[in-house]
């Protein structure tokens, strides 16, 4: 019961923390992590568009979610622009602060989900101009994503701010803008003429492969950190869900690109039936990789639940929305696999998971509104714009290091006592 009371005060208590500040002053602490909520909202719209079992009004619900996402994305762009103009120097500080710069890709990912949602929610109700708009937006996004990703990786390598004990799953985010180029292509390919569809299929596969291989490298580094240092503090563990998305989105992208290629152009590559071969290979690869996504989901879920059951202090973070987008990939992958292997059971599982992730999304929205009201977000020292790692996080790692040192000393003493005992036995035996 004590833990329940603690969690209530941390996540649901409506008492205001700290003296009231004007919203204009609080916007100095509006960080890139806020775009994770727009990214997650766009993901919910994408899930809604793929439901296998549909009912009257579901498409209207998807349109409402899409419009809501566009609204908050516009609001966030205005807020981050206001911060950079009103408080000079915060833009350069953002780029140099590893706690904040890792979430900069979420802004591009939020835009990417908006482009992806144009096909199910705008294309059927507009004219030929929407085909051109989708195509132009896609290739502009590809160019911007490539420039941004190279710049961000160079910046991180140049500053090298991380050590093995501060490695976090969010390190995979910098490659996401390139990887999401494949996801966008898979979502919009059927809106394009055959020749343009072929270009998108080729680019989508290439970018998805790039994202997946970089993910494998970062995933190995994270596993090394988990084995040697342990899990993160409880409040940061929802970020582990980020590791779910790359294998899931890779399977989803390959499947949807294959479906689009088959619908638009049977000879997408060389050969009369190359699209059918692509669909077979895509289904095989999606089945091959979905196990990794499910494993990462289960590991993250158990870690989060275990963290919530401890007495560690937990503070809501807007970056928790990243787990919505990550799990959206797994849900959509399951739904499209059900379509590929013609299994209603798999489609039902995917739909149930989609409803579940939508409920979690609503809960996170309520937690966000509450955190803004009580000044646990958009407040000095409470967001990702801090110059250093949070003191409680550093204390957590210091505690782990002290435990490791104590354990090493105990093991050393036991070994010395064992050696001394063996020596005495040998000496007495010789006498």
From Swiss-Prot:
Pfam families cross-referenced by the UniProt entry: SLAC1 (PF03595)
Topology of this chain in the membrane: Multi-pass membrane protein
GO CC list: membrane
Membrane-spanning residues: 30-50, 62-82, 101-121, 136-156, 167-187, 201-221, 239-259, 284-304, 318-338, 346-366
Cited CDD domains: TDT_Mae1_like (cd09317)
Renumbered residue ranges of the record's region Disordered: 402-431
Chief location of this protein within or outside the cell: membrane
Location in or out of the cell: Membrane
Keywords: Membrane, Transmembrane, Transmembrane helix
Compositionally biased residues, Basic and acidic residues: 402-424
GO MF term (any one): transmembrane transporter activity
Superkingdom of origin: Eukaryota
Family: Belongs to the tellurite-resistance/dicarboxylate transporter (TDT) family.
Protein name: Putative malic acid transport protein
Organism listed in the record: Schizosaccharomyces pombe (strain 972 / ATCC 24843)
């Amino acid at each position: 019961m004590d833990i329940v009371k603690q969690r209530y005060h941390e996540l649901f208590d409506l008492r205001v923390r700290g003296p009231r500040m004007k919203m204009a002053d609080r916007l100095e602490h509006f960080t890139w992590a806020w775009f994770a909520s727009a990214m997650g909202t766009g993901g919910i719209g994408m899930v809604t568009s793929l439901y296998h079992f549909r009912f009257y009004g579901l498409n209207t619900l998807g349109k409402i979610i899409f419009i809501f996402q566009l609204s908050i994305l516009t609001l966030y762009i205005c807020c981050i622009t206001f911060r950079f103009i009103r408080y000079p120097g915060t833009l350069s500080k953002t780029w140099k602060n590893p706690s904040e710069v890792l979430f900069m890709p979420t802004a591009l990912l939020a835009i990417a989900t908006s482009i992806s949602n144009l096909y199910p929610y705008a294309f059927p109700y507009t004219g030929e101009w929407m085909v051109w708009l989708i195509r132009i937006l896609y290739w502009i996004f590809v160019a911007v994503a490539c420039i941004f990703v190279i710049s961000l990786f160079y910046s991180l390598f140049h500053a090298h701010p991380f050590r093995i004990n501060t490695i976090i799953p969010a390190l995979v985010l910098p490659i996401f803008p390139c990887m999401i180029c494949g996801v966008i292509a898979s979502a919009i390919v059927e809106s394009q003429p055959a020749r343009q569809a072929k270009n998108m299929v080729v680019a989508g596969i290439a970018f998805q492969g790039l994202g997946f291989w970089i993910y494998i490298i970062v995933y190995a580094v994270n596993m090394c950190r988990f084995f040697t240092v342990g899990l993160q503090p409880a409040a940061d563990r929802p970020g582990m869900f980020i590791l779910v998305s790359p294998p899931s989105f890779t399977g989803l992208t390959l499947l949807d690109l294959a479906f689009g290629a088959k619908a638009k152009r049977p000879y997408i590559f060389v050969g009369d039936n190359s699209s059918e071969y692509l669909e077979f290979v895509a289904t095989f690869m999606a089945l091959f990789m979905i196990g990794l996504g499910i494993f990462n989901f289960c590991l993250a879920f158990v870690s989060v639940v275990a963290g919530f059951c401890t007495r560690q202090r937990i503070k809501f973070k807007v970056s928790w929305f990243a787990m919505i987008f990550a799990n959206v990939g797994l849900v959509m992958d399951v739904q499209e696999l059900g379509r590929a292997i013609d299994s209603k059971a798999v489609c039902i599982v995917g739909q149930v998971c989609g409803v579940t992730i939508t409920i979690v999304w609503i809960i996170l929205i309520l937690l966000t509104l509450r955190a803004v009201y009580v000044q646990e977000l958009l407040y000095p020292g409470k967001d990702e714009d801090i110059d250093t790692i949070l003191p409680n996080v550093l204390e957590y790692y210091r505690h782990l290091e002290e435990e490791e040192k104590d354990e090493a000393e105990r093991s050393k003493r036991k070994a010395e006592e064992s050696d001394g005992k063996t020596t005495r036995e040998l000496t007495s035996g010789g006498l």
